[in-house]
Amino acid sequence: MSKEDFVIKPEAAGASTDTSEWPLLLKNFDKLLVRSGHYTPIPAGSSPLKRDLKSYISSGVINLDKPSNPSSHEVVAWIKRILRCEKTGHSGTLDPKVTGCLIVCIDRATRLVKSQQGAGKEYVCIVRLHDALKDEKDLGRSLENLTGALFQRPPLISAVKRQLRVRTIYESNLIEFDNKRNLGVFWASCEAGTYMRTLCVHLGMLLGVGGHMQELRRVRSGALSENDNMVTLHDVMDAQWVYDNTRDESYLRSIIQPLETLLVGYKRIVVKDSAVNAVCYGAKLMIPGLLRYEEGIELYDEIVLITTKGEAIAVAIAQMSTVDLASCDHGVVASVKRCIMERDLYPRRWGLGPVAQKKKQMKADGKLDKYGRVNENTPEQWKKEYVPLDNAEQSTSSSQETKETEEEPKKAKEDSLIKEVETEKEEVKEDDSKKEKKEKKDKKEKKEKKEKKDKKEKKEKKEKKRKSEDGDSEEKKSKKSKK
């Protein structure tokens, strides 16, 4: 045979599926790093966009264009009444007069409210200055100065305590300025909890003319902006009316988005179907349950655990970095921070190993009691191989006893030292208690002396007063007798 026969020749491999157009959390699925390609698909759950209407609504979010005048809580309560759902929440309060992006979470999606409330926000604001500026470029310059970490105190009329706090303005741009009407329009990207009203007042102070906020609109809240399928309250009401009267789901499905839209920015870890329900019950994700993972995951990063169908299971804290995930063959991948998926949507798959199955069979045959404990019918081999938890504890206790006998002289020394230290501490405590008692006694005596002194002085004053009154009366009598 010639040497050429043993050369590995290139093969025409088929092109991998293009997942750049796949929806939500499955986008660019092929670019995830593969830990294992082997798993058993379970016919449970469904793709977020193909859920039945009831579960689609109960795990949905609405990117609402909040109208001016009603408060955020009122708007959310109206949506709850319109959609007839159990609970609703929103992504951060907007003042009654403020309009724009308000993310309304429904039922299961309310578990993501906290993460959205802490996310960054973007606003377009109209500021009214109290006087004309000498140089129109001053407004842009002072806006640039007001970036980074700023001290802010909540406005006079606010629902929170007016404490000084630090808030960050990431970026701001002046859009337009009319010096004749003293009006300026600017855009700002800032941290959650920033007061734009206070920012406008600070702008006026910097410019030396004074100013206040005229109008405000939020254009982005967390993951969603005003360009991401924003709807009005009328749309929500019309969609529910159309469904009630014509049974047409399309309008409702178009205004409500799956909760996975809020998690698109998180790094992903794909979980085997058999491990999903265990994670829903709060179990940590281990290496055997891992299918794919994203590049650039660092230790303690906030990540999202997803199923092979693209459903969000939970928001979790990574316990391994990408490098560890590639090299480790056992260990904890992530611990659950906030579970999103319903329990028992996927079937239970724990307790299905060979030992667990054998134990189950032996219980049925009467070779173990109903609690899985050894009885008279248990085979000797099982007793040798399988060590239950209480036996393990007994064995550890016996080993501890042997260790204790060896370490008795050491312990005696340690105990004597500890006793000495304790006696010293007790003596110090006694001295302290004596001092305290003495101080209390002295204080009491001083107080009593002071009270006695005060009483004596009062008595003397009364006597003096009485004597002076008696003297006056005698003088009057003598005068009358002379007359």
Swiss-Prot record:
**Superkingdom of the source?**
Eukaryota
Return one Gene Ontology term, BP aspect. Answer: snRNA pseudouridine synthesis
What does the UniProt entry list as the effect of changing D95A? Answer: Abolished pseudouridylation of rRNA. Abolishes pseudouridylation at position 93 in U2 snRNA
First and last residues of every sequence repeat: 434-436, 437-439, 440-442, 443-445, 446-448, 449-451, 452-454, 455-457, 458-460, 461-463
Modified positions (Phosphothreonine) are: T378
Instruction: From the UniProt entry, list the residue stretches annotated as the region Disordered.
Output: 357-483
Which sites are catalytic?
A: D95
EC numbers, comma separated? 5.4.99.-
UniProt keyword Iron present: no
What's this protein's function? Catalytic subunit of H/ACA small nucleolar ribonucleoprotein (H/ACA snoRNP) complex, which catalyzes pseudouridylation of rRNA. This involves the isomerization of uridine such that the ribose is subsequently attached to C5, instead of the normal N1. Pseudouridine ('psi') residues may serve to stabilize the conformation of rRNAs and play a central role in ribosomal RNA processing. The H/ACA snoRNP complex also mediates pseudouridylation of other types of RNAs. Catalyzes pseudouridylation at position 93 in U2 snRNA.
Which additional comment does the entry carry? Present with 33600 molecules/cell in log phase SD medium.
What protein name does the entry list?
H/ACA ribonucleoprotein complex subunit CBF5
